[in-house]
């Protein structure tokens, strides 16, 4: 059921980022969905808050492994729920480093790469 929902979301042209996809208890066929996310040009969010507070490291390890395998770009996000945590992604970066995840696939690791993506996806946003 959850796999089917993610496959449907992947086909939605209004969705650019697949967020909170490592939630414990809501696992899905990661392999099948990462392939579909790649095919549909989606980014996968690596969510610091979920890693830190919701014990999603195991699921994220598998998701990151598959994103690397299928060259699915990711976007790292603090998802801060308190002002002092804005911009903190220590655990997310650690998981990416553990997998030797290519920096070129981390969209927001480079401002030019991020701007290019935003411009391509939503050309009228930056005007």
Can you describe what each PLM-predicted range is?
Residues 1-5:
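Active-site glycine-rich loop that binds ribose-phosphate moieties when present
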């Amino acid at each position: 059921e959850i796999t089917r929902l993610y496959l449907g979301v992947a086909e939605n042209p209004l969705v650019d980022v697949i967020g909170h996809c490592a939630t414990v208890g809501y696992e899905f066929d990661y392999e099948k969905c990462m392939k579909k996310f790649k095919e549909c040009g989606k980014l996968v969010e690596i969510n610091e808050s979920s890693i830190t507070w919701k014990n999603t490291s195991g699921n994220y390890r598998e998701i990151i492994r598959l994103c690397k395998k299928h060259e699915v770009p990711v976007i790292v996000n603090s998802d801060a729920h308190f002002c002092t945590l804005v911009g903190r992604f220590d655990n997310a970066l650690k998981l990416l480093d553990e997998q030797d995840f290519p920096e070129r696939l981390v969209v927001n690791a480079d401002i030019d790469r991020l701007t290019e993506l935003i411009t391509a996806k939503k050309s009228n946003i930056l005007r």
